[in-house]
Swiss-Prot record:
Gene3D superfamilies: 3.30.70.100, Calcium-transporting ATPase, cytoplasmic domain N, Calcium-transporting ATPase, cytoplasmic transduction domain A, HAD superfamily/HAD-like
GO BP annotations, alphabetical order: copper ion homeostasis
Pfam families: E1-E2_ATPase, HMA, Hydrolase
Record's subcellular location: Cell membrane
Keywords: ATP-binding, Cell membrane, Magnesium, Membrane, Metal-binding, Nucleotide-binding, Phosphoprotein, Translocase, Transmembrane, Transmembrane helix
Name under which the protein is recorded: Cation-transporting P-type ATPase B
């Protein structure tokens, strides 16, 4: 049934509500809850079986009302608690569930081994049946089919009360039917047994299915245990990320004293102290102190970053040395750290189109299986087979037809991929990215802040005449830096940064729009526009003239340095390319992708950057809206476009592309516009992110092919009487185990 669409007129009143749903045991349960919720007018719901979270867009309904709807469907629900920082006491629900299942599994397995051995012996060699053999088998089977299998029976009973079915219904009915038939055979009138042998035992187990009932319980418990453990491992990366948050923070009081409070109580604009080895509690600005900060947990970047006063810092990172006084600019759920955790959680609760199809199939699958099982048993009876043979076929169909693998195919892969991506600094916001990635053929780059560092630097120093020695170069740079150290111009900072130890300047003079001058070490030094420097003494030095023409043709800034009235050097100042730019572009081209540069710079500058990094083509003089037009034109030409931007002024282009990747620190614009957030300021994460998305889609497709193929092939085989119910139970458990194990391979993505 299609979910009611919330109209545009109602957008202002639409509330997004997330519920934690417990009691779901398979994809059919999730489909049932989703259907119940979507029957409510003005509600659009999506229920994820793997994460047990219902995401609901509702008009005019409160969370408790929606919880009531879920309760009426036979499950439990409570408003989802947004957690950004987990303390050590936080429990892992999947891990706890796995431990409970393990206790039942161990008891069941210990009893199943002698039960299977004795059952096989008594079936193959009837003469070995000692007096009371039926009681022995019953005593061994009873704890398994009752206590160990109780999780299945309890859900089946609840389903029966609500007139619904689920995977547990199939399992419980199979176990109960096999047990009842076996007890009837053991303690009822037994026909004389003709012949013996292993093949006869495998085909019908001598009409006694206690080992089948116990075996199905063991195999299904094992499958559920490994499934729960895999889901726990899949979420471990997210839990580890969340646990990085500071638990306590030392707030700096007005009198200089420090007060330690829980990090959750920190307020915006409060100042706090962070010492070596401590985690920064919130996003903020350094007010006092200097320290190296370990960003690896947040960005995957191994190299520490040095923070000085006025530098921005990110919560969740660790101070390695020094003491920092930080003023909080974002706290709690507003921090970048919290936003990244939410991104992973939201990605894990979304559904791909393939998963919606799988959930729909699972929702109707169980009733269909009962019909097929009944028809198969009836057909065998009509064909002249005995009741025990017909029952064996019916039981085999019920046991083998588990749709659990179908329901786990996509969510488990997404959970593992999003967790691994978080460890690498790659945050996939949802399935849109995964479903688009396989058809990407064009990657478009912004320049400033994406291919470049977004900060001016001296790129070349050209000396005049015979002054080509390194000593002459350092001397001129030092003189220029000394004069510029008194200036506040952006170009000045680049020149000062190029000289390690500029000297003092006297008589500093700044001429607006032209340059600066001053006395340094007894020399009169001028730094500025070539036209201003040569206003009285023309420069005819070929090297300097050539450097000026080359730099200006590339859209770079060229300044001359004059010492005592003689032009000594030309400094070319430009936005520096990132070290990773060329390698990242080469990696993309090696994957057969076309690369394009979009920039607001002039044609010469755009072509120069494109040539330096190996980009196929460049489009210059672009305003933000012009970038959107270019991307739209590429899409109209049949290309599938990925846009890589810094997320600040590239928001429209990131949204307009088929796939948006925001690289950098994850600004609000980036988080809202991009499909993939690359926290590390390293362009090599672009091909890595594309590879992760492709690997995830390959895993999902493999899981879906297996899950669909298994059910399509297994049911006819069981209906044909070619599978003993015990083997059917093992095959069903292996199906789910294969899916979760295949998904867990993504945990090793990118490991070198």
């Amino acid at each position: 049934m299609a979910a009611p669409v919330v109209g545009d007129a109602d957008l202002q009143s639409v509330r997004r509500i997330r519920l934690d749903v417990s009691g779901m045991s398979c994809a059919a349960c999730a489909s049932r809850v989703e259907t119940k919720l979507n029957k409510i007018p003005g509600v659009r719901a999506s229920v994820n079986f793997a994460t047990r979270v219902a995401t609901i867009d509702a008009v005019g309904m409160a969370a408790d009302e929606l919880c009531g709807v879920v309760e009426k469907a036979g499950y439990h629900a409570a408003p989802h608690t947004e957690t950004t920082v987990l303390d050590k006491r936080t429990k892992d629900p999947d891990g706890a569930h796995a431990r409970r299942l393990l206790r039942r599994l161990l008891v069941a397995a210990v009893l199943f081994v002698p039960l299977a051995d004795l059952s096989t012996l008594f079936a193959i060699v009837p003469s070995a049946r000692v007096p009371g053999w039926g009681y022995i088998l019953t005593a061994l089977a009873a704890p398994v089919v009752t206590w160990a299998a109780w999780p299945f029976h309890s859900v089946a009973l609840r389903n029966a009360r609500h007139r619904t079915t689920s995977m547990e219904t199939l399992i419980s009915v199979g176990i109960v039917a096999a047990t009842a038939w076996s007890l009837s055979s053991v303690f009822g009138d037994q026909p004389p047994r003709e012949g013996s042998g292993i093949w006869r035992a495998i085909l019908n187990s001598d009409s006694i299915y206690l080992e089948v009932a116990a075996g199905v319980t063991v195999f299904v418990l094992a499958g559920r245990y490994f499934e729960a453990r895999a889901k726990s491992k899949a979420g471990s990366a997210l839990r580890a990320l969340a646990e990085l948050g500071a638990k306590n923070v030392a707030v700096l009081l007005p009198d200089g004293a420090e007060l330690v409070i829980p990090a959750s109580e920190l307020k915006k604009r409060q100042r706090f102290v962070t010492r070596p080895g401590e985690t920064i509690a919130a996003d903020g600005v350094v007010v006092d102190g200097s320290a190296a900060i370990d960003m690896s947990a947040m960005t995957g970047e191994a190299k520490p970053v040095r923070a000085y006063p006025a530098a921005s810092v990110v919560g969740g990172t660790v101070v390695m040395d020094g003491r920092l006084v930080i003023e909080a600019t974002a706290v709690g759920a507003d921090t970048q750290f919290a936003a990244m955790v939410r991104l992973v959680e939201q990605a894990q609760t979304q559904k791909a189109r393939a998963q919606r199809l799988a959930d729909h199939i699972a929702g109707v699958f169980v009733p269909v299986v009962f019909v097929i099982a009944g028809l198969a048993g009836a057909a065998w009876l009509v064909s002249g087979a005995g009741a025990d043979r017909a029952f064996s076929v019916t039981l085999g169909v019920l046991v083998i037809a588990c749709p659990c693998a179908l329901g786990l195919a996509t969510p488990t892969a997404m959970m593992v991929a999003s967790g691994r991506g978080a460890q690498l600094g790659i945050f996939i916001k949802g399935y849109r990215a995964l479903e688009t990635i396989r058809s990407i053929d064009t990657v478009v780059f912004d320049k400033t802040g994406t291919l470049t560092v977004g900060q001016l630097a001296v790129s070349t120093v050209t000396m005049a005449g015979s002054g080509t020695s390194e000593r002459d170069r350092e001397e001129v740079l030092g003189l220029a830096a000394a004069v510029e150290s008194a200036s506040e111009h952006a170009m000045a900072a680049a020149i000062v940064a190029a000289s390690p130890d500029p000297g003092p300047v006297n008589g500093f003079v700044a001429v607006a729009g032209c340059g600066v001058s001053g006395e340094v070490g007894g020399h009169h030094v001028e730094v500025g526009k070539p036209s201003w420097i040569t206003r009285t003494t023309p420069c005819h030095d070929a090297a300097l003239v050539s450097a000026r023409l080359d730099g200006e043709s590339r859209g770079e800034t060229v300044v001359f340095v004059s010492v005592d009235g003689v032009v000594r050097a030309a400094l070319t100042i430009a936005d520096t390319l990132k070290d990773s730019a060329a390698a990242a572009v080469a990696a993309l081209r090696s994957r057969g992708l076309r690369t394009i540069l979009l920039t607001g710079d002039n044609r010469a500058a755009a072509d120069a950057v494109a040539a330096q990094v190996g980009i196929d083509s460049a489009v210059a003089d672009m305003l933000p809206e012009g970038k959107v037009d270019v991307i739209q034109r590429l899409r109209e030409e049949g290309h599938t476009v990925a846009m890589v931007g810094d997320g600040i002024n590239d928001g429209p282009a990131l949204v307009g592309a088929d796939l948006g990747l925001a690289i950098g620190r994850g600004t609000d614009v980036a988080l809202g516009a991009a499909d993939i957030i690359l926290v590390r300021d390293d362009l090599n994460t672009v091909p890595q992110a594309l590879d992760l998305a492709r690997a995830t889609m390959r895993t999902i497709r493999m899981n879906m092919i297996w899950a669909f193929g298994y059910n399509v092939a297994a049911i006819p085989i069981a209906a044909a009487g070619l599978l003993n119910p015990l083997i059917a139970g093992a095959a069903m458990a292996f199906s789910s185990f294969f899916v979760v194990s295949n998904s867990l391979r993504l945990r090793n993505f990118g490991a070198q």
